[in-house]
Amino acid sequence: GVLSLLKKLPMILKHLHGK
């Protein structure tokens, strides 16, 4: 659900900034 997406957002942002 939305909560799952919100929890994944920080990880995705870290992955993008990790580049």
UniProtKB/Swiss-Prot annotation:
Asked whether the keyword Membrane is assigned, the reply is yes
Which GO terms of type biological process are on file?
Answer: defense response to bacterium; defense response to fungus; innate immune response; killing of cells of another organism
Tissue distribution is: Expressed by the venom gland.
Q: Where in the cell is it found?
A: Secreted; Target cell membrane
Keywords on this record? Antibiotic, Antimicrobial, Fungicide, Immunity, Innate immunity, Membrane, Secreted, Target cell membrane, Target membrane
Give Gene Ontology CC terms. extracellular region; membrane; other organism cell membrane
Query: What function is annotated for this protein?
Result: Antimicrobial and mast cell degranulating peptide which probably acts by forming pores in membranes. Active against both Gram-negative and Gram-positive bacterial strains as well as against yeasts. Has little hemolytic activity. In the context of inflammation and cancer tests, is weakly cytotoxic to normal cells, induces calcium signaling but does not impact cAMP production. In addition, prevents LPS-induced nitric oxid (NO) synthesis but does not affect the IP3 signaling and pro-inflammatory activation of endothelial cells.
Family, as annotated: Belongs to the xylopin-like family.
**What protein name does the entry list?**
Antimicrobial peptide Xac-3
The organism named in the record is: Xylocopa violacea
Q: In the record, what lineage is assigned to the organism producing the protein?
A: Eukaryota, Metazoa, Ecdysozoa, Arthropoda, Hexapoda
